[in-house]
Amino acid sequence: MNPENPPPYPGPGPTAPYPPYPQQPMGPMGPMGAPPPQGYPYPPPQGYPYQGYPQYGWQGGPQEPPKTTVYVVEDQRRDDLGPSTCLTACWTALCCCCLWDMLT
């Protein structure tokens, strides 16, 4: 078998799963198939939500609801009750004794 000249495909051949899209007419047409109104040469933006309603805070429209501030606090647990805890307590007592001695 020659890779540059394969044998013909037996059968009707592969078909596409969907029919092709029809071609859209080109020209000065509006989004609904009619020419745009006078003084409005461009169609409105396609992604605008709720056509006819202003966004939050625009021209007296509804105000955006207040946002709630959330603070995340992590509780630190120290389960290493050992030499470091004892050392911290000793240093605290020594400092307190030194301060007491200086003040009296």
UniProtKB/Swiss-Prot annotation:
InterPro entries assigned to the protein according to its UniProt record, in alphabetical order: CYSTM1-like
Is RNA-binding one of the keywords? no
- Tell me where in or outside the cell this protein is found: Membrane
Query: Where do the TM regions start and end?
Result: 81-98
Q: Tell me the keywords, alphabetical order.
A: Membrane, Transmembrane, Transmembrane helix
Superkingdom of origin: Eukaryota
GO CC list: membrane
The family note in this entry says:
Belongs to the CYSTM1 family.
Which named protein is this? Answer: Cysteine-rich and transmembrane domain-containing protein 1
Organism source for this protein?
A: Mus musculus (Mouse)
Q: Which lineage do the record's taxonomy fields give for this organism? A: Eukaryota, Metazoa, Chordata, Craniata, Vertebrata
